[in-house]
Regions:
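Cell-envelope/extracellular polymer assembly enzymes that use nucleotide-activated donors
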Residues: 17-19, 50, 186
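Short beta-strand/loop segment that forms part of the nucleotide-sugar
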Residues: 47-57, 74
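A conserved acidic beta->alpha catalytic loop
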Residues: 55-63, 104
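Glycine-rich, basic loop-to-helix element that forms the pyrophosphate-binding segment
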Residues: 76-92
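Short aromatic/hydrophobic "clamp" motif used to bind/position activated sugar donors
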Residues: 97
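Conserved donor NDP-sugar-binding/catalytic core segment of glycosyltransferases
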Residues: 108-138
Length: 254
């Protein structure tokens, strides 16, 4: 059973076609480029969209940067990625949702492809394969190639970029707030199952990958990351532990 604070959606606004939701905690270094890239992508879409940045209790200028860039800022005080994403979805005023990480560049062609699919009546949601903004260590590169294969084969979206029908998102309960990481995997499965009943596909796009930050692969060794992922694959209930998921919540001291 999904545990979520997602209880209602803001009533859709007729002239807002899609919503891009960005969860952000202390992302003043990456958010400007992410928003600049997003604005560029949105210019290529004829329909009107909105940007929602969820300030997840930041202590830096994340919220100010978002407002200056024209985004709506939603405050979520509880530090949890799933809850931040749900808060953004709850505030969204459209029928199409796009979730984008604050350290990720969205290619214009990818946004167009995702929205076109959602509007086609054949797709309930999906994600994309990953590229990174800098070369990765050898083992890390192999891990990402393996993940991209798993993503395509099993139709599992990475959290960096997820798109879906708002009705599918709300019908399946949104992101599970019992977990502190991996919530995108569980959501992918639930929306895919929901879509199957509606004759709608959950698809992983490959032609225009997002470009996301490689910072974690430089903060931690590839072996550390590989062992952590192995732990979660064997013991998925460990994703309910904030301590065990600290990889996603702590950063090295500057």
């Amino acid at each position: 059973m999904v545990h979520s604070t997602l209880k209602r959606q803001t009533a859709p606004v007729r002239d807002i076609y899609y919503s891009v939701i960005i969860p952000a905690y202390n992302e003043e270094a990456f958010l400007p480029d992410t928003l600049a890239g997003l604005h560029l992508a949105m210019k290529a879409i004829p329909q009107k969209g909105e940007i929602i940045v969820v300030d997840n209790d930041s202590t830096d200028s994340t919220a100010e940067i978002a407002r200056k860039a024209g985004a709506r800022v939603v405050f979520e005080p509880f530090r949890q990625i799933a809850r931040a994403r749900n808060s953004g979805a709850r505030a969204a005023r459209s029928a199409l949702l796009v979730f984008l990480d604050a350290d990720t560049i969205l290619p214009p062609a990818l946004l167009n492809q995702a929205l076109t699919l959602l509007a086609s009546g054949t797709c309930c949601g999906g994600g994309t394969v990953l590229n990174f903004d800098a070369p990765l260590p050898f083992l890390a590169g192999r891990l990402i190639k393996f993940w991209n294969w798993i993503s395509r084969t099993n139709r599992l979206a990475a959290g960096s970029f997820i798109f879906c029908l708002a009705r599918a998102f709300h019908a399946t309960g949104g992101f599970d707030e019992k977990t502190f990481a991996g919530e995108e995997i569980f959501l992918s499965r639930r929306i895919s199952a929901w879509g199957k009943k509606q004759n709608l596909l959950f698809t992983i796009l490959e032609k225009h990958p997002v470009i996301t930050s490689s910072r974690k692969f430089h903060w931690y060794s590839s072996l550390q990351i590989a062992l952590l992922l192995l732990l979660f694959s064997i013991f998925p209930f460990a994703l309910r532990s904030r301590l065990l998921c600290r990889f996603w919540y702590t950063r090295p001291m500057k």
